[in-house]
Amino acid sequence: MSTIENFDAHTPMMQQYLKLKAQHPEILLFYRMGDFYELFYDDAKRASQLLDISLTKRGASAGEPIPMAGIPYHAVENYLAKLVNQGESVAICEQIGDPATSKGPVERKVVRIVTPGTISDEALLQERQDNLLAAIWQDSKGFGYATLDISSGRFRLSEPADRETMAAELQRTNPAELLYAEDFAEMSLIEGRRGLRRRPLWEFEIDTARQQLNLQFGTRDLVGFGVENAPRGLCAAGCLLQYAKDTQRTTLPHIRSITMERQQDSIIMDAATRRNLEITQNLAGGAENTLTSVLDCTVTPMGSRMLKRWLHMPVRDTRVLLERQQTIGALQDFTAELQPVLRQVGDLERILARLALRTARPRDLARMRHAFQQLPELRAQLENVDSAPVQALREKMGEFAELRDLLERAIIDTPPVLVRDGGVIATGYNEELDEWRALADGATDYLERLEVRERERTGLDTLKVGFNAVHGYYIQISRGQSHLAPINYMRRQTLKNAERYIIPELKEYEDKVLTSKGKALALEKQLYEELFDLLLPHLEALQQSASALAELDVLVNLAERAYTLNYTCPTFIDKPGIRITEGRHPVVEQVLNEPFIANPLNLSPQRRMLIITGPNMGGKSTYMRQTALIALMAYIGSYVPAQKVEIGPIDRIFTRVGAADDLASGRSTFMVEMTETANILHNATEYSLVLMDEIGRGTSTYDGLSLAWACAENLANKIKALTLFATHYFELTQLPEKMEGVANVHLDALEHGDTIAFMHSVQDGAASKSYGLAVAALAGVPKEVIKRARQKLRELESISPNAAATQVDGTQMSLLSVPEETSPAVEALENLDPDSLTPRQALEWIYRLKSLV
């Protein structure tokens, strides 16, 4: 904001604006003026750049022209969406006074603050993604982290112990807005994130947090929520809740509990693992060819959001998983009937949040009614499903016949967007409203009846009833008959050829008609608000119903996917290990134009590490990733792409796959690789699944080999994690001879003439050839380069004392060998008989051969 030195020099309207702006200095202020929201001074300049709207000037105040930009009120949602997507927050200032009775500027106040993490408007949200507000706190013992989805009321907290875990949480939750304390030490952890909001220290005070949360939940303490002994998480949660209340300017009745997320309850995946497994986002940042793109055929937005939460937080409780498996199995014969009905339920979860915030629009209530209308059919279909968990969901979703009847009576079939447009409440719902509407709509009929009646009563054939904007309703009699006007006719206007009169009945009717539209609209708004009061006492049951419907959508979807994609139900075992028969990569098999080659896998305490060798393009990375994805799918309760799967307990999944420079942080490919490797070696346990792909690249051969060897030893002997270790260092294939629990497998390739066929099938034992030059030739590397590479390869093999180990079988020849031309010097030597040469001839041959080389 430009410095305003002399406040009194401004006009009263600008003084009002400046007072309101001073309360919200860091965010944009939309100031309502008639049919527009106006922005002034620096706000106007900023908005014109962000929204690409015209920057103009408005008169002058304090002797200076005022920079101004404006947007029409009816298009405000579109502009808010643009600003929120850019991480901006906006204070919405409305006229709350009556211009007709106001002395000076109309009274205005900020009625809500729209921020990226607290939006609930349908137009501003991505319907199939959670939109989270988060707060982060740090002290000497670790981190506190809280998230709130204001569009559903889901409130969570956690206490990540270290920086890596905190980074993984930030990546998993991906908040739209993040609150942090002004003295937050680990700024590098959050720098570059969208929607950062610096908050004063006192907002994170623990006693204030407990008080805020108890007040919100109507409790004396937080023991019942299991968060009493999580002080760091509570500090974050307290700040977050206060911020949500401040921005919404209303109570938040849909936030009725808080849940502690504990590491031991779910499989932990760090940021690199989530990225490498391409769960909801591919490596390029898009949504194509991700696990979600294959698994998510849910028919409601709230079901889609729940499935993504499951995928990012696989549960370790086998009781929950077995229940989900049983439900999926029971639902497989009912998916075709259930999905079309579920599709009609829509996004009930977010509609309920807007109801709680009292911002639900008429079409929200119409959609809620439509959702209620699906419940009887859903309940009837589910009655036939022989499954206790399904019947529990059926009961939880309820029926809400009374609320359905209420909304069917109250709201018209296709209501307008806004209640202020009128015509929302159905005819017959309220007698007084019907009367006001009849007055507004039926004025012409009444006037015609009055004219006929008065003509008959007075006998005056020139009498007629009319209306004009200046004098309102009137009875007009020609000047020739005006002396016969009844005594109760009061003169209103004299014309050249007629007199106009008013009677008490017509005056009363005039007052009614002129105010009927305004009264009808005011009463309609009142009745609409009363609908909220009738619905909100049922909010808790409605939220449970929405949750049950979302879960049913996810489970029906997983049942459909299992049947359509030929998935099998995995079996959980007590000991660490993974045994997969005919396993497939869930994403790759969908994008291939040819049948996917299924592969087995066997990991157990006695066979806990597989050294995977084979050619580039042979399928090593696919094989490793499919193992992790099958494990991940099993631990959300889903069926999996395989013929048979047995899987033991898993606490973490780690991946060190692929490589990329982190230029923004000044870290090279090798540094990124080593950082991820260090995280694995520090945090993996015997219950962890570890994928290590090409460890040791990016440095010298011997450095890389030494690091890869030491890492493999550590994982196999000390940590004893279940490990898939892909490598091009053939020396590592000796590890099974040197330690227990390690085995070699390889991906096969076949040569056929001048071509190479990658079989993509996993075989026991080490690979016999590298095929690096073959792949280079396939990629189109020029023949002369391939030829030179082969010459160099032979030189290196002849020099290396460990050539045999490097080659495994002594051959490193490319399958796509380009026939070499015989050197002229070699040809000359082959034709030479040294025994027949004189000393002079021998000397001449040496010079000749020298010239040929």
From Swiss-Prot:
<dbReference type="InterPro" id="IPR005748">
    <property type="entry name" value="DNA_mismatch_repair_MutS"/>
</dbReference>
<dbReference type="InterPro" id="IPR036678">
    <property type="entry name" value="MutS_con_dom_sf"/>
</dbReference>
<dbReference type="Pfam" id="PF01624">
    <property type="entry name" value="MutS_I"/>
</dbReference>
<dbReference type="InterPro" id="IPR027417">
    <property type="entry name" value="P-loop_NTPase"/>
</dbReference>
<dbReference type="Pfam" id="PF05190">
    <property type="entry name" value="MutS_IV"/>
</dbReference>
<keyword id="KW-0234">DNA repair</keyword>
<dbReference type="InterPro" id="IPR016151">
    <property type="entry name" value="DNA_mismatch_repair_MutS_N"/>
</dbReference>
<dbReference type="InterPro" id="IPR017261">
    <property type="entry name" value="DNA_mismatch_repair_MutS/MSH"/>
</dbReference>
<dbReference type="GO" id="GO:0030983">
    <property type="term" value="F:mismatched DNA binding"/>
</dbReference>
<dbReference type="GO" id="GO:0140664">
    <property type="term" value="F:ATP-dependent DNA damage sensor activity"/>
</dbReference>
<comment type="similarity">
    <text>Belongs to the DNA mismatch repair MutS family.</text>
</comment>
<dbReference type="InterPro" id="IPR036187">
    <property type="entry name" value="DNA_mismatch_repair_MutS_sf"/>
</dbReference>
<protein>
    <recommendedName>
        <fullName>DNA mismatch repair protein MutS</fullName>
    </recommendedName>
</protein>
<keyword id="KW-0067">ATP-binding</keyword>
<dbReference type="GO" id="GO:0006298">
    <property type="term" value="P:mismatch repair"/>
</dbReference>
<keyword id="KW-0227">DNA damage</keyword>
<dbReference type="InterPro" id="IPR007860">
    <property type="entry name" value="DNA_mmatch_repair_MutS_con_dom"/>
</dbReference>
<dbReference type="Pfam" id="PF05192">
    <property type="entry name" value="MutS_III"/>
</dbReference>
<comment type="function">
    <text>This protein is involved in the repair of mismatches in DNA. It is possible that it carries out the mismatch recognition step. This protein has a weak ATPase activity.</text>
</comment>
<dbReference type="GO" id="GO:0005829">
    <property type="term" value="C:cytosol"/>
</dbReference>
<dbReference type="Pfam" id="PF00488">
    <property type="entry name" value="MutS_V"/>
</dbReference>
<dbReference type="InterPro" id="IPR007695">
    <property type="entry name" value="DNA_mismatch_repair_MutS-lik_N"/>
</dbReference>
<keyword id="KW-0547">Nucleotide-binding</keyword>
<dbReference type="InterPro" id="IPR000432">
    <property type="entry name" value="DNA_mismatch_repair_MutS_C"/>
</dbReference>
<keyword id="KW-0238">DNA-binding</keyword>
<dbReference type="GO" id="GO:0005524">
    <property type="term" value="F:ATP binding"/>
</dbReference>
<dbReference type="InterPro" id="IPR045076">
    <property type="entry name" value="MutS"/>
</dbReference>
<dbReference type="InterPro" id="IPR007861">
    <property type="entry name" value="DNA_mismatch_repair_MutS_clamp"/>
</dbReference>
<dbReference type="GO" id="GO:0003684">
    <property type="term" value="F:damaged DNA binding"/>
</dbReference>
<dbReference type="InterPro" id="IPR007696">
    <property type="entry name" value="DNA_mismatch_repair_MutS_core"/>
</dbReference>
<dbReference type="Pfam" id="PF05188">
    <property type="entry name" value="MutS_II"/>
</dbReference>
<feature type="binding site">
    <location>
        <begin position="614"/>
        <end position="621"/>
    </location>
    <ligand>
        <name>ATP</name>
    </ligand>
</feature>
